Amino acid sequence: ARDGYPVDEKGCKLSCLINDKWCNSACHSRGGKYGYCYTGGLACYCEAVPDNVKVWTYETNTC
């Protein structure tokens, strides 16, 4: 497992400012342990998502 920003079908981060509950649900649906809105990144951040779940990386950024 690893931590990271989950991505949508376009490979973009999930935008998130203050809705931690929504982000936590999005992380759980991907098999993650916990999720919260990371203000610095303006995106949903997940902890302990399975390795097969795509997370955002600078190298593969298409947004």
From Swiss-Prot:
Give any Pfam family that matches.
Toxin_3
Q: In which tissues is it expressed?
A: Expressed by the venom gland.
Q: Does the keyword Secreted apply?
A: yes
Query: Alphabetically, which GO biological process terms does the record hold?
Result: defense response
- An annotated GO cellular component: extracellular region
Every LCN-type CS-alpha/beta domain range: 2-63
- Tell me the InterPro entries matching this sequence: LCN-type_CS_alpha_beta_dom (IPR044062), Scorpion_toxin-like (IPR003614), Scorpion_toxin-like_sf (IPR036574), Scorpion_toxinL (IPR018218), Scorpion_toxinL/defensin (IPR002061)
Q: What does this protein do?
A: First blocker of sodium channels (Nav) found in scorpions. Is lethal to crustaceans (Cambarellus montezumae), less toxic to insects (crickets) and non-toxic to mammals (mice) at the doses assayed.
Q: What is known of its domains?
A: Has the structural arrangement of an alpha-helix connected to antiparallel beta-sheets by disulfide bonds (CS-alpha/beta).
Q: What is this protein called?
A: Toxin Cn11
